[in-house]
From Swiss-Prot:
The gene is pdxK. Mg(2+) binds at residue 142. The keyword Nucleus does not apply. GO terms for molecular function: ATP binding; hydroxymethylpyrimidine kinase activity; metal ion binding; phosphomethylpyrimidine kinase activity; pyridoxal kinase activity. The lineage of its organism: Bacteria, Pseudomonadati, Spirochaetota, Spirochaetia, Spirochaetales. ATP binds at residues 139, 176-180, 189, 205, 214, 239. GO terms for biological process: thiamine biosynthetic process. This is Putative pyridoxine kinase.
Length: 269
């Protein structure tokens, strides 16, 4: 059995974060384990605004100790790391257990909170985790933060961001554009392996029920790597997986909706 570890925030709505990751791992026929670094809630009395409740260092460390015990972990993904101790713990355990496949989803802002994480946390993530990443999966805002450029608005700017991020240490870079580029009629992302740029395109699903799509694609990439796929093939599989889920998306509450991940069955089953 392939064992996968997701490290990140729990989303009380169930659509994103650890909850999305574990659903994704299950769809790939893998056994998912989790380490929570924070819990994200939504307040319906305040227009569904989000709050991030970080967990203490001992709690994070004890979970990592449990997750890595016993049967070896095939691949690891990290998402929301909203504290210095969470970032440092993840870096420590990646090194201690010589993790060969690591997907770094550099969550720098929580949708609905309106606030980016503290700049010093972003810099610490880049310093400690980016050089360890088999694949890093920034969105356009995160690409700008890591690469030190303006938010990309064209494919060429996405490529430049990917190149600069690769220079900072990541083995492979997957810049998630989705449908956010001006005039874009497809869900378009850029993959860079240090030598070649690949455009990864699929249908742009306009339902609006896309909460957790970024978490899901990085989790699916993690599952693909854990299954032995190359980084590029894992990304192609993840793209199909997410698009299929979004086609069958549904409303979770008055604020968000999410993709129906059960509508897709990968060839690994």
């Amino acid at each position: 059995m392939v064992k996968l570890l997701s490290i990140g925030g729990s989303d009380a709505s169930g659509g994103a974060g650890i909850e999305a990751d574990l659903k994704t791992f299950q769809e790939y026929g893998a056994f998912g384990v989790a380490t929570l670094t924070a819990i994200v809630t939504m307040d319906p009395s305040r227009n569904w605004s989000h709050r991030v409740h970080s967990l203490e260092e001992d709690c994070v460390r004890d979970q990592l100790e449990t997750a890595f015990a016993g049967v070896g972990v095939s691949a690891v993904k990290s998402g929301m790391l909203a504290s210095v101790h969470a970032i440092e713990c993840v870096a420590e355990y990646l090194e201690r257990f010589a993790v060969a496949a690591y997907v770094f989803d550099p969550v720098m802002v929580c949708k609905g909170s309106g606030d980016a994480l503290h700049r010093e946390l972003n810099e610490l993530m880049i310093q400690k985790l980016l050089p360890r990443a088999t694949v890093v999966t920034p969105n356009l805002f995160e690409t700008a933060q890591i690469a030190g450029i303006s938010v990309p608005r064209t494919v060429d700017e996405m490529k430049e961001g990917a190149r600069l991020i690769h220079e900072r240490g990541a083995s492979h870079v997957f810049v998630k554009g989705g449908g956010r580029l001006p005039g874009c009629k497809h869900a378009l992302d850029v993959f860079y392996d240090g030598k070649t740029f690949h455009l990864v395109e699929d249908e742009l699903v306009q339902s609006g029920w896309n909460h957790g799509a970024g978490c899901t694609v990085s989790a699916a990439i993690t599952a693909g790597l854990g299954r032995g796929l190359t980084a590029y093939d894992a990304i192609l599989s993840a793209k199909r997986f997410v698009t299929t889920g979004l086609r069958h998306g549904f409303q979770v509450n008055q604020w968000v909706g999410t993709g129906n991940l059960s509508k897709w069955r990968d060839r690994f089953h």
